[in-house]
Amino acid sequence: FTLLLPVPDDAFTRSFDGIVGGAFAFLAMYLMPRDPRKNPRARAQALMDAFAKVFQLSSEAIRYYDYNKAYQSLLDARALQPLYDACRGDLITAQGMNELSWNSRKSKGELARMAKTLAAVDLAIRNDRVLNRRMASTIHHVQLRTAAQLSLSDALTELSVAAQSLGLGMSAPTEGEREHYMMEARERMIKLAGTLEPRTMGVATFEGESLVLMLRLIVVDFMEATGMSHKDAVAVLVPLGEAVTKHAPRTSAIPIVDADMDDSTVVD
């Protein structure tokens, strides 16, 4: 019989084994690629489902003027950031895997579209945190009219439904389904954008007006998430009328502070 001599276990041998193993792994990934869209789709759906629940809780908080629910909605809104970061991370990984795949054209467009949608959703999440913080403060310190409570609640409910549609628009398996849900969210937001005017919504306090303004920002973010340009999204917003509160600041009076002076001057 033949006795084989043991292979010396030196650094070169281990490096060679690693190179060979990596080459075979790369070849297997290239020839039999896994669908890179699976994880980002699931993450996007989970993110938007959680976002929809935040809007729904906010809707209940302002409708029933419940500070505890408003504060909880703020905490839940803050908890969206880790979900977004995980979704964004999976998307970046998926795009990298897709570049190494021989049939990358199949997934490239969908992943690029998802990246644009997530960028707009990120802005909406940030604006929603501000909205919920202001809403909790408003409920704690100011009593809004019943009409204002109901109209704000209805708007938040619409955002909740739109968030669910956006989630389906990113996670549905076919292009036709994704387009359907994106258009559904867009049409809902365009309709809502035409109603977000303080006077129309029964708002008569400065605090209530600030909530309406924040809603307008989130609606624009969601319209951009469906693929609309920023210019087109802003264009469908109902124009704002004059301030309805007596104590609202005049936007034409801008205080300018000179660094070398103690007093400030107001320029009209």
What residue ranges belong to the model's regions?
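A transmembrane helix-and-boundary motif of multi-pass membrane transporters/channels
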Residues: 1-76
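Hydrophobic residues within the alpha-helical transmembrane core of Major Facilitator Superfamily
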Residues: 27-28, 87, 124
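Short, charge-rich amphipathic alpha-helical segments embedded
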Residues: 78-92
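Conserved catalytic-core motifs characterized by acidic clusters
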Residues: 32-34, 92-110, 139-142
